[in-house]
Regions:
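Low-complexity or membrane-interfacial segments used for flexible interactions
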Residues: 1-40, 46-49, 62, 73-75, ...
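A low-complexity, Ser/Thr/Gly/Pro-enriched, surface-exposed linker/loop concept
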Residues: 51-61, 68
Length: 185
């Protein structure tokens, strides 16, 4: 199964919801921001039922988010090893990202098992126009967002944990947004 969302580097810097849709163009989830100190995000179904919350932990040296999903509390944090590329870890599940986070091309793995793969999806001009027309109706995506070729695809290895995996991916996006704004400051 695959889900899609628009990666807007400052994804959570505004109060407009981010919509996640499936391969048929149906909105499956909506991510809404709450106006608080630090980020507080809610992952909702199209019927506004909360399936997860993602809250920034402000008292840390590195970007860290707490994900509450399926009765569990998971910590998603960014690691910056000195001689290697950065990666994220998810406590309690022993998940780790492998790949290129800042280019949105990575896998989430547990030991040697792939949980999900996230990658940028490039569209041709005709595909972008058709996609924009479809998304304009369902996802309220500005055309400028698509012109950058910044649609991300999440390919799930396990459909049973869809909300959990999606909440972790959105927490990773939030970690990357915090990290890029702090490193550019």
């Amino acid at each position: 199964m695959k889900l899609y969302y628009i990666d807007q580097r400052k994804l959570f810097s505004f109060m407009q919801p981010v919509e996640v849709w499936d391969e048929q163009g149906n909105v499956r989830y909506r991510l809404k921001s709450e106006c608080t100190v630090g980020y507080h995000l809610h992952l909702l179904t199209p019927y506004d039922e909360e399936v997860a919350s993602i809250r920034q932990n402000l008292l840390t040296m590195v970007p860290k988010f707490i994900v509450k999903v399926n009765g569990k509390e998971l910590a998603v944090s960014l690691k910056h090893p000195l001689n290697d590329s950065e990666y994220c870890t998810v406590t309690d599940l022993n998940w780790k990202t492998e790949g290129f986070l800042k280019y949105r091309t990575y896998q989430i793995t547990a030991e040697d098992q792939q949980i999900a793969k996230v990658q940028m999806v490039e569209f041709s001009k005709g595909e972008k126009d058709a996609l924009y027309e479809a998304l304009k109706k369902i996802a309220h995506v500005p055309e400028s967002a698509l012109s950058q070729g910044n649609c991300c695809e999440i390919d799930f290895s396990d459909d049973l944990n869809e909300a959990e995996i999606l909440a972790v991916v959105m927490a990773i996006e939030a970690v990357l947004c915090i990290d890029s704004s702090s490193s550019s400051a």
